[in-house]
From Swiss-Prot:
Binding site for substrate: 19-28, 110, 137-138, 212, 250, 359
Effect upon mutating residue 365 to S: Large decrease in N-succinylarginine dihydrolase activity
Catalytic activity: N(2)-succinyl-L-arginine + 2 H2O + 2 H(+) = N(2)-succinyl-L-ornithine + 2 NH4(+) + CO2
Family: Belongs to the succinylarginine dihydrolase family.
One term of GO molecular function: N-succinylarginine dihydrolase activity
Name the record gives this protein: N-succinylarginine dihydrolase
Gene name of the encoded protein: astB
Swiss-Prot/TrEMBL induction comment: By nitrogen starvation, and arginine. Induced at stationary phase via sigma S.
Amino acid sequence: MNAWEVNFDGLVGLTHHYAGLSFGNEASTRHRFQVSNPRLAAKQGLLKMKALADAGFPQAVIPPHERPFIPVLRQLGFSGSDEQVLEKVARQAPHWLSSVSSASPMWVANAATIAPSADTLDGKVHLTVANLNNKFHRSLEAPVTESLLKAIFNDEEKFSVHSALPQVALLGDEGAANHNRLGGHYGEPGMQLFVYGREEGNDTRPSRYPARQTREASEAVARLNQVNPQQVIFAQQNPDVIDQGVFHNDVIAVSNRQVLFCHQQAFARQSQLLANLRARVNGFMAIEVPATQVSVSDTVSTYLFNSQLLSRDDGSMMLVLPQECREHAGVWGYLNELLAADNPISELKVFDLRESMANGGGPACLRLRVVLTEEERRAVNPAVMMNDTLFNALNDWVDRYYRDRLTAADLADPQLLREGREALDVLSQLLNLGSVYPFQREGGGNG
């Protein structure tokens, strides 16, 4: 059956700021306390969405979350009106204010793990929300992510959206950023590669930075998504590269159809894994980048593998890269050798995503891949699909509500909270989502 990969990109939120909240993510730590530009960040993301949609790649948008998220501050013991809560937390514990104001939901590669209908036992598309247990600021995302996905994939005959796994370290799940699918045409059954960093009883794990994904979580997600057990491989990421800042697998590997583009040191027991994939995936091709050409350190600083590998109708592929790759002579030299070599990659497309990159999120972090048949695509909420009208409406919306300068101190401004709620009220109507945000359900909307 014919099917297409649709990229659902996260729209950057109004409180995008640099707080260094993500230990193990070196870009996040390095840019802590810099001044951010939320308006520019949102526009950089929108430009990528529109350019890819114009190039013929199906593209959609996932909206931001409500931030600052006051209900969690109340859970932490701050009381009074919303304004009083903001004032108290800013004075007594500003780090909590930064955490509940993070715009991290923009990295929707961590929103959920997807199983296309060709891979599932019941023939539905399954989406399991990630609990993002390893980081407090990200662990807040799951309930609203679930509401958003249910509003976008709202046909229960075709889509099953599963709640996140329990919030415990044993079941730490980071979503599609640790998941690859390999195979032939999108509509054919594929091999699902779940990548984890640690498992109970296995001493092979990183020592400097945390391994955010557990094997136990990956196995549970595969069960929830009803993936045919014959179509699943579990593989451990190389703990040494996690300790060098590769906090998700999508920082060191990217797949598309029959191709796995990865670093030579991406996986534990890599040669064994690649042999397994060759045996089980028709036409499988591994493009391994040697450490002698691109070091792990350069991989992390340029986000070479946090790229999108997209298929054209003729079978050729385009690699979507952040600008940092072009600015690094060694990485850019390697990429041009790759273009000249015998493989499906025939074009490099570069985007300026500096605002997101400075927090450790490249092109692949910003998108959730969902393989859909034509019938399934028609069942998706059409208001989220990118086109000229939506692009212009979202740009106008960003111009109206987003600030062009934000520091950690600005997060205490009650006007920022009011602006954010009004903006999301308008956006949820624009995208025909219903009342997906807690403030709307509590009657606190500004519509």
